């Protein structure tokens, strides 16, 4: 018999009754039923009930066991007594009568119990992550993550893609976040950077004559903590293709992502044919570029009904051309109590309030706005929005670029409060036609709005002759249930267009050459049209595991202060290490 096991803890069935077996694992739970000891033994594969009575030669050893001790158990498989089956376990019809126990690894007092799913402070969970990972739900999430990545790889290869590995040590480049820098010992005063994404390398692969690249790529960004992103690193399904259009990328990737979701959606419906929503339309309808399409509410511009009306606040605003009034329908929200609750919520979000109209059973509008604009305008708003008696509409006004984010929050809030969101489905969509540039209010300059390597719609002509803030890019995102899960674009593969695109964003040609020298040189020697995308593995896994916390699907994550509490990173290093790197610390005063 094998030194440690003849079977795993998830393997035994009724067909194994009367066999002598050996299992090894952790003591998951120990129960004393009046002299009868039950030990639930757990390993990676499952749970097996083991039992010892005073007649067992191993009874005294069994009495000494404690939770999470690692043991080897020998014994005979027998049928559980009638009425004690556990149908929640694959091994739930049998148990092992213990004849011998060997302690392989005793455990001290546990700072974090493994049995059960009690909530514990995050810092305790991260410091003792090896215990946390033994817990069933987190353990299963990690296994699901591995299976999702396997599904991605399989589907990419079925689409004719080939997996490559690109360098981890590379050059620093401006890609939207701070780099993690790695000092060079051989070249004092110079630094490598960990890649924020394999962007340049995957484009260089296309210029090297390869096609249909993919990689499950680690990416590193030195960003301030955010609720929807882990500090430090994340993984993406990185993709690039040659001689393709935007539609070709969509045709290749839609079945991959749809298939992965269908594999792990546990029967929840998944969008079959994805809608394509222009960025500007997404903002107007949903107040965000990552809409949750499970929420049926669509906002509309109702400015014409308030222009010159008796509601002077909105009427005066509309005298300025850039201002608008948007309506957010609230089906079923036509009660004074609900409207007042939404108004209070808006004030809690820093707004002066949230104007509303309710429609009574007779069809007449009610509320301060309705009283001010009169029944004719109120009826026209109701007709435009397709509302009925018992419904309401809420209004935001001013410069849309200033209020759009709040309008999106209000739409989300209404969908949740009115139970309009179907939580049991996955709604996927393409968001297209992103602006190439945006105005950076902090730096008072035009900046790239997304990927700086994207092709502008209209090409060089647009870069030379259009107002930069009106140029659209061949840039696209994939959204699911209110999350951006992928982003991509068709690349700018002509060197003169690349230089001009960066020039508009304030980078001179020499700076482009200095920062992107490898790619700039490659563009001089025949670059094919190419494009691709990157899908966030972590966010996809998070959605499919049904959690809102990325730490619940990551093996050894950092905390929100970018600290690895298990390994003690970031850590001090020795003076000798600093001398070898020619680094002298100049720390801020506390």
UniProtKB/Swiss-Prot annotation:
Site note Important for tRNA non-discrimination, residues: 33, 83
Q: Which GO terms describe its biological process?
A: aspartyl-tRNA aminoacylation
Record Gene3D superfamilies: Bira Bifunctional Protein, Domain 2, GAD-like domain, Nucleic acid-binding proteins
Q: Where does L-aspartate bind?
A: 175, 221, 450, 491
The keyword Zinc is assigned to this record: no
Principal location class:
cytoplasm
Q: Name one Pfam family in it.
A: tRNA_anti-codon
Q: Where does ATP bind?
A: 221-223, 484, 536-539
List the subcellular locations: Cytoplasm
Q: What is this protein called?
A: Aspartate--tRNA(Asp/Asn) ligase
Origin: domain of life: Bacteria
Q: Name one GO molecular function term.
A: aspartate-tRNA(Asn) ligase activity
- Record-level GO cellular component terms: cytoplasm
The record's EC number reads 6.1.1.23
What lineage is this protein's organism placed in? Bacteria, Pseudomonadati, Pseudomonadota, Alphaproteobacteria, Hyphomicrobiales
From what organism does this protein derive?
A: Rhodopseudomonas palustris (strain BisB18)
CDD domains xref list: EcAspRS_like_N
